[in-house]
Curated annotation (Swiss-Prot):
Protein name: Tubulin beta-3 chain
GO function terms (MF aspect): GTP binding; GTPase activity; metal ion binding; structural constituent of cytoskeleton
Species for this entry: Drosophila melanogaster
Region spans: Disordered: 435-454
SUPFAM superfamilies to which the protein is assigned, alphabetical: Tubulin C-terminal domain-like, Tubulin nucleotide-binding domain-like
Gene name, Swiss-Prot/TrEMBL: betaTub60D
Keyword terms, alphabetized: Cytoplasm, Cytoskeleton, GTP-binding, Magnesium, Metal-binding, Microtubule, Nucleotide-binding
Subcellular localization, as worded in the UniProt entry: Cytoplasm, Cytoskeleton
C-alpha cells in the first residue's frame, strides 16, 4: 500500500506526533500495545499506510502493529514523556533517536553542530523504515519553526531525505511563531532560517499557529484555559483528515501527490492554511446533527483557520476539502460550487475550478461527518510579513547573532534567508493582484509589485 513514514522532531513535534498516533490508533482500532481490538475489516484494510505489522505474538491474536514513526530530539526529556505516555509502548524502541546536549532554541545547533552529529543515526532508521514499505508514498514531519531542534535539525533532515528520495512527497506540519504569544526571543531568526529551507525542499507545508489554536479553543470550543494537549488535539484532527483517503475507502480519493498537484500552482507557493469542521465544544457534540451546508460554511469560516491569517485579506489560489462520513456527493458538489459562486472575489479567476473535493465514507470517532479544509491563500503572506518584520528589527542591530556565528554560521546566511522570505511575500502579492487578462512576464522584477490587500 501507499505507506507514509512519520518523523517528529523536537519537543513540539513529538507532542503533536504523540497525539496524532493516539487519534490514528483509535480510528484503526489499535490499542496502546499495538494489538488490534477493532470491530470492522475496514480498519485493517489499509492499516499499513501508517503501521508495520510485526510478527505474530500468538497464532490467534495476529501481529502487533508498529507505527512507521521516527522520534528525534536533541535532549532526552520529551522522549521519556512520550515513552511513559499512554501510547509509549506502541513505538519501536530503536526508533527513538536522541542526543543529550539539547539545541537551546538555537537553529544553528540543530542544523550545523549538535543536529548534524545525530542526523546520520536518524537516516539509518529512516532507511530501515523505508525498506519495510512496499510502495513508499512520502514522508510527513511534525515540528515547530521557533525552537532549535524541530526547526534546525528538522530542516537538515528534510534536505538529507530529499537527496536520498527525490521523487517522494515531503509533507510538513510546521508550527509557526504566533503574533502575540512568544516562547522564545530568537523565534524570528529560527523561523526565517527554517522557511528559507522549507521553500526549497518541501512539497506541502501546513502552517499551524498556536495563537489561532488558542482562539479556536477560547471562542469556539469554550475551553477557559486550554492546555497544549487541547491544541495538539486540534492539529492531529487535521493531520488525520488529510490522510483519510489513503487509509479508508471513499467515493473520491486523494493522496499526498494528488493533493500536491491540485494545490500547488507554482513550486514555491506550497504553504497551506488548514482548518477543520465541525468545531463544537466537547460536551455538545452528540446533541447536534450536522448538515453538509453547515459543514461547508463552518469550514470556510475565518475563525476555523489554524493559522493566524485572515483569508478575507487575500485570495484563494486553490482549496482542497476532504469530507468524511456518509453524505450525498451531489450535495457536496453543490455546496462547494455555491461557496465559490457566492465568494467569487476571494478566488483567483485565472484558475477555474480551483477547489478539489475528496469524500471518504468513514467518519472520525465520535462524529457523524466532518471535513478538513486546506487552503492555499495569498493571505498567508501576512504570516511571513510578521516574522520578517520581527527578524529585521533584531537583525538590524545584530542582536543575539553571536549565538549563531559561534556555531559557525555566517551573517550572509541570515541576509539570504531574509531576502528569500521577502521574495515569497512579493510572489504571493503578485498573484493576488493578477487577473486572467494579464500578460504574465516572469522576468518582471518582483520587487516592483506592491499594493494593498483586497
Amino acid at each position: 500500500m501507499r505507506e507514509i513514514v512519520n518523523l517528529q522532531a523536537g519537543q513540539c513535534g513529538n507532542q503533536i506526533g504523540a497525539k496524532f498516533w493516539e487519534i490514528i490508533s483509535e480510528e484503526h482500532g489499535i490499542d496502546s500495545n499495538g494489538i488490534y481490538v477493532g470491530d470492522s475489516d475496514l480498519q485493517l484494510e489499509r492499516v499499513s499506510v501508517y503501521y508495520n505489522e510485526a510478527s505474530a505474538v500468538t497464532r490467534s491474536s495476529g501481529g502487533k502493529y508498529v507505527p512507521r514513526a521516527i522520534l528525534l530530539d536533541l535532549e532526552p526529556g520529551t522522549m521519556e514523556s512520550v515513552r511513559s505516555g499512554p501510547y509509549g509502548q506502541l513505538f519501536r524502541p530503536d526508533n527513538f533517536v536522541y542526543g543529550q546536549s539539547g539545541a537551546g532554541n538555537n537553529w544553528a545547533k540543530g542544523h550545523y553542530t549538535e543536529g548534524a552529529e545525530l542526523v546520520d543515526n536518524v537516516l539509518d532508521v529512516v532507511r530501515k523504515e523505508c525498506e519495510n514499505c512496499d510502495c513508499l508514498q512520502g514522508f510527513q514531519l511534525t515540528h515547530s519553526l521557533g525552537g532549535g531542534t524541530g526547526s534546525g535539525m528538522g530542516t537538515l533532515l528534510i534536505s538529507k531525505i530529499r537527496e536520498e528520495y527525490p521523487d517522494r512527497i515531503m509533507n510538513t506540519y510546521s508550527v509557526v511563531p504566533s503574533p502575540k504569544v512568544s516562547d522564545t526571543v530568537v523565534e524570528p531568526y529560527n523561523a526565517t532560517l527554517s522557511i528559507h529551507q522549507l521553500v526549497e525542499n518541501t512539497d506541502e507545508t501546513y502552517c499551524i499557529d498556536n495563537e489561532a489554536l488558542y482562539d479556536i479553543c477560547f471562542r469556539t470550543l469554550k475551553v477557559s484555559n486550554p492546555s497544549y494537549g487541547d491544541l495538539n488535539h486540534l492539529v492531529s484532527l487535521t493531520m488525520s483528515g488529510v490522510t483519510t483517503c489513503l487509509r479508508f475507502p471513499g467515493q473520491l480519493n486523494a493522496d499526498l501527490r494528488k493533493l500536491a498537484v491540485n494545490m500547488v500552482p507554482f513550486p514555491r507557493l506550497h504553504f497551506f492554511m488548514p482548518g477543520f469542521a465541525p468545531l463544537t465544544s466537547r460536551g455538545s457534540q452528540q446533541y447536534r446533527a450536522l448538515t453538509v451546508p453547515e459543514l461547508t460554511q463552518q469550514m470556510f469560516d475565518a475563525k476555523n483557520m489554524m493559522a493566524a491569517c485572515d483569508p478575507r485579506h487575500g485570495r484563494y489560489l486553490t482549496v482542497a476539502a476532504v469530507f468524511r462520513g456518509r453524505m450525498s456527493m451531489k450535495e457536496v458538489d453543490e455546496q462547494m460550487l455555491a461557496v465559490q459562486n457566492k465568494n467569487s472575489s476571494y478566488f483567483v479567476e485565472w484558475i477555474p475550478n480551483n477547489v478539489k473535493t475528496a469524500v471518504c465514507d468513514i467518519p472520525p470517532k465520535g462524529l457523524k461527518m466532518s471535513s478538513t479544509f486546506i487552503g492555499n491563500t495569498t493571505a498567508i503572506q501576512e504570516l511571513f510579513k510578521r516574522i520578517s518584520e520581527q527578524f529585521s528589527a533584531m537583525f538590524r542591530r545584530k542582536a543575539f547573532l553571536h549565538w549563531y556565528t559561534g556555531e559557525g554560521m555566517d551573517e550572509m546566511e541570515f541576509t539570504e534567508a531574509e531576502s528569500n522570505m521577502n521574495d515569497l511575500v512579493s510572489e504571493y502579492q503578485q498573484y493576488q493582484e493578477a487577473t486572467a487578462d494579464d500578460e504574465f512576464d516572469p522576468e518582471v522584477n518582483q520587487e516592483e509589485v506592491e499594493g494593498d490587500c483586497i
